[in-house]
């Protein structure tokens, strides 16, 4: 069971060609019936008994095994101790640990499960502190503030990255140089290289869960978002990467880039769904798909744009009436924005332990980030209505438009200024994920000269050549 299976219970950034998509689809065929051969390994309690290699394999296999959903608090503490023992041995042994990992799928499962248990423990601890109903568990959690602590988890991920020198290796690959020249004694071993690589994806996820979206994107500076990337070979890692990158872009108001991220992974999933049927993760991916469509519906409402035909059809099928309500804006759309956001956002966590002595002071991180997002939605709530009026004129008096909208002229002026500022978005062109150029996100622009509004509209023609090439490739 992977991360997606528990949700809700639990390249190049430009348009990719169908040839590249087909390569990803073909690669996924190899993953459907994948078996890493480690299912027979039993959990061990010590790395010092028996064969050291076999013990380490057993520890890694146990680390990749999901914890039971109703696990007790003592079991969660024990799981944390086991992870500490495992990573301490890998990171602090005299010289590299000699072990050939069976596959990169396995390395991803270890990091994925490690972060999932951290995330679920933080949510559980916050829930106990806020309810104040179980004093025995609250006391146990109060006495162990560092168990599954944020610092400990981040320290493990950063240490694995540093030990493997994976960032230096990835940077060398981008320069066309030999990565082994920069790998060092540890990074040349598959165990360290794979754990280090997927720790980068893990950092993206953790920083996003903590609400630091710019740092989340910064962690991927040395990873190229294309079909050749290692994460693209593992369905769960591929899905996770694009989901968290897209969500981070959305929270940074880079809606165009967020739509591109979501569209990529949704098209990929739609093309591989026949291979997923019957697999253990099919239901989980289907649920996560609905979340992705909810996020793309939000982005399209805040940033109207043309979508891929496949995405557009599926979006109208899933959220047809709701999408229209979002696009019309106004106060009636606020509850729908909040509902979709809550259903599709990550399960945010707090970086610090809660205050068990004052339960009322503990804020739900999901509520906190939802409130931040809804403040942004409220700023742009009347943009669709204002836009519909401005499209009818080349010049218009501010007071006249205020009369149409039944608001005070100065209130309208503030709306117009906010709308114009929000229409300037950073859009990725090349380089790191945080880089980009400031562009106008709308085909409607205006300027204020005292009380006179000057309106200009530019419509980009559809790129018919690209459309024909894309559809011909699908037919032939």
UniProtKB/Swiss-Prot annotation:
Keywords, alphabetical: Cytoplasm, Initiation factor, Protein biosynthesis
Glycoprotein keyword on record: no
Annotated signal peptide: none
GO molecular function, one term: translation initiation factor activity
Main subcellular location: cytoplasm
Keyword ATP-binding attached: no
One GO CC term, this protein: eukaryotic 43S preinitiation complex
InterPro entries noted in UniProt: eIF3l (IPR019382), PCI_dom (IPR000717)
Lineage top rank: taxon: Eukaryota
Subcellular location: Cytoplasm
Annotated Pfam families: Paf67 (PF10255)
GO biological process, one term: formation of cytoplasmic translation initiation complex
Residues in PCI domain copies: 257-452
Residue runs in coiled coils: none
Family: Belongs to the eIF-3 subunit L family.
Functional summary from the UniProt entry: Component of the eukaryotic translation initiation factor 3 (eIF-3) complex, which is involved in protein synthesis of a specialized repertoire of mRNAs and, together with other initiation factors, stimulates binding of mRNA and methionyl-tRNAi to the 40S ribosome. The eIF-3 complex specifically targets and initiates translation of a subset of mRNAs involved in cell proliferation.
Subunit structure: Component of the eukaryotic translation initiation factor 3 (eIF-3) complex.
Protein name, entry field: Eukaryotic translation initiation factor 3 subunit L
Organism, as annotated: Neosartorya fischeri (strain ATCC 1020 / DSM 3700 / CBS 544.65 / FGSC A1164 / JCM 1740 / NRRL 181 / WB 181) (Aspergillus fischerianus)
């Amino acid at each position: 069971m992977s991360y997606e299976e528990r949700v809700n219970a639990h390249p190049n950034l430009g348009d990719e060609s169908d040839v590249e998509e087909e390569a990803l689809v073909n690669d996924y065929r190899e993953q459907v019936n994948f078996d890493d051969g480690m299912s027979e390994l039993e959990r061990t309690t010590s790395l010092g008994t028996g064969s050291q290699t076999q013990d380490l394999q057993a520890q890694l296999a146990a680390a990749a095994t999901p914890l039971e959903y109703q696990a007790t608090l003592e079991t969660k503490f024990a799981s944390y101790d086991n992870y500490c023992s495992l990573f301490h041995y890998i990171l602090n042994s005299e010289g590299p640990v000699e072990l050939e990992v069976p596959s990169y799928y396995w390395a991803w499962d270890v990091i994925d499960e490690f972060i999932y248990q951290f995330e679920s423990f933080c949510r559980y601890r916050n829930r106990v502190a806020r309810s104040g109903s179980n004093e025995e568990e609250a006391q146990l959690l109060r006495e162990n503030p560092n168990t599954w602590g944020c610092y400990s988890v981040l320290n493990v991920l950063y240490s694995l990255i540093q030990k493997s020198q994976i960032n230096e290796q990835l940077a060398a690959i981008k320069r066309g140089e030999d990565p082994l020249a920069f790998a060092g004694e540890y990074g040349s071993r598959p165990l360290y290289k794979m754990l280090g690589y997927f720790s980068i994806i893990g950092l993206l996820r953790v920083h996003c869960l903590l609400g630091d979206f710019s740092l989340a994107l910064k962690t991927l500076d040395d990873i190229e978002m294309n079909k050749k990337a290692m994460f693209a070979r593992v369905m769960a890692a591929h899905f996770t990467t694009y989901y968290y990158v897209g969500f981070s872009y959305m929270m940074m108001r880079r809606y165009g880039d967020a739509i591109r991220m979501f569209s990529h992974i949704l098209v990929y999933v739609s093309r591989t769904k026949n291979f997923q049927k019957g697999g253990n993760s099919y239901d989980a991916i289907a649920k996560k798909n609905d979340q992705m469509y909810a996020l793309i519906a939000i982005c399209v409402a805040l940033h109207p744009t043309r979508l891929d035909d496949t995405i557009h059809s599926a979006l109208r099928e899933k959220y047809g009436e709701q999408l229209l309500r979002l696009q019309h804006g106004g106060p009636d759309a606020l509850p729908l924005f909040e509902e979709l956001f809550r259903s599709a956002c990550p399960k945010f966590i707090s970086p610090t332990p809660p205050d068990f002595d004052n339960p009322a002071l503990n804020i739900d991180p999901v509520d906190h980030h939802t409130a931040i997002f809804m403040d942004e939605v409220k700023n742009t709530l009347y943009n669709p209505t204002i836009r519909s009026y401005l499209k009818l004129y080349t010049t218009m008096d501010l007071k006249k438009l205020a009369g149409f909208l039944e608001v005070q002229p100065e209130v309208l002026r503030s709306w117009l200024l906010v709308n114009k500022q929000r229409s300037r978005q950073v859009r990725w062109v090349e380089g790191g994920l945080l880089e980009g150029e400031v562009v106008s996100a709308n085909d409607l622009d205006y300027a204020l000269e005292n009380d006179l509004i000057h309106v200009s509209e530019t419509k980009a023609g559809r790129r018919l050549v690209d459309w024909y090439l894309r559809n011909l490739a699908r037919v032939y």
